[in-house]
Amino acid sequence: MKKNKLILCDLDGTLFDTIKVNYCSYKKALKEINYDIEYDFFIKECYGKHYKTFLPKIGLNEEEMEIVHKIKKRLYNKYLNEAKINIHLFNLLELSKNKYYIALVTTASRKNSDEILNYFDKRELFDLIIAAEDVNNKKPNPEGFIKAMEYFHVSSENTLVFEDSDVGIEAAVKSGANILKVQKF
């Protein structure tokens, strides 16, 4: 059966609750260069945003940001046991995979995306992964969503995006796709 529809999913907060994974990874990475981050600040200012957006808010310069991000990516898999899977969304994706292309569009790194998908044995469900390294413009820019639609030759009208964050929803709106907002699970 030829597919002509597409489902795009965000990673953090949509497919997985990774708040603790990311918080612990960043907290430990920041500690290595003598910085600290409080949980409430992380939730409000950092989670779901690109590291170059929030790390300057705690006083890091460009070089320090790159060091912290590199350390964070290295530490990420040590905290995967803290992640929670959105089993209902994954069940829906499993039911849809014969009629829809399924792609991940995330601002997370490819390394961290692959690690969590492999940890939960869900990597094979995705026909395409567009990670932070694959785009020039991060969400709220729709580049990642548009790239996925172009890859599969599927129109925005035949695309459904699952997103949780304001920037992700803004990017989905700009792409012209249909949107379902994922709430806490």
What are these regions (language model features)?
Residues I37, P56-E94:
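Metal-dependent phosphoesterase signature
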Residues M1-K3, S96-Y100, F152-N158:
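Glycine-rich phosphate-binding loop signature in dinucleotide/nucleotide-binding domains
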Residues L15, I102, N137, V161-F162:
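Conserved SAM-binding loop
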Residues S109-L160, D166-K174:
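Substrate-recognition "cap/lid" segment bordering the active-site pocket of phosphatases
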Residues M1-K44, K174-S175:
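Active-site neighborhood of HAD-like aspartate-dependent phosphohydrolases
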